[in-house]
Amino acid sequence: MYIEIVDETGLVSEEIIKQTQDILEFAAQKTGKEKKEMAVTFVTNERSHELNLEYRDTDRPTDVISLEYKPELDIAVDEEDLLNHPELAEMLDDFDAYIGELFISVDKAREQAEEYGHSFKREMGFLAVHGFLHINGYDHYTPEEEAEMFGLQEEILTAYGLTRE
């Protein structure tokens, strides 16, 4: 998985940047998204507030904003064409590679790590996986959706070795 990571805050250690890269690659492998691309930007609460207002019409900062990329137009291709022209299938895979972008508030992550009694490292990993699942179509509006998403989230974090401390 290709992941572009930008730290707008200048406050995120190389260790956390590497962990973010590694855990997202691990989550991609667990969910069959290894050939996808995404971006992660670490932001302040102030920037998170601006983005939350712009994209979600919510007037407060939040921990992670997940912007799933959905092309405006579907590309319709005959299945027989894909079988007869494997290069076309490969080209479509490349075209459809970008899945979205996460904005993780470093300030919120620190606040929540303290509030929940676990490490900043664990909270940053949690937010990366949580956002990753959102841009891959998971949500938690209903009890059923929540059970599915949170179950997979915990499975990924535990298998990666990032448990609640």
UniProtKB/Swiss-Prot annotation:
Task: Tell me how the cofactor is bound.
Answer: Binds 1 zinc ion.
Q: Where in the cell is it found?
A: Cytoplasm
Q: Name one GO molecular function term.
A: metalloendopeptidase activity
The species this protein belongs to is Streptococcus gordonii (strain Challis / ATCC 35105 / BCRC 15272 / CH1 / DL1 / V288)
- UniProt-annotated binding residues for Zn(2+): H130, H134, H140
GO BP, one example?
rRNA processing
Q: What cofactor is needed? A: Zn(2+)
Name the enzyme's class.
Answer: hydrolase
User: Could you tell me the keywords of this UniProt record?
Assistant: Cytoplasm, Endonuclease, Hydrolase, Metal-binding, Nuclease, Ribosome biogenesis, rRNA processing, Zinc
Q: Does the keyword Magnesium apply?
A: no
> Which family is annotated?
Belongs to the endoribonuclease YbeY family.
Show the GO cellular component annotation of the record: cytoplasm
**UniProt cross-references to PROSITE patterns, sorted A to Z:** UPF0054 (PS01306)
Please report the name of this protein according to its UniProt entry: Endoribonuclease YbeY
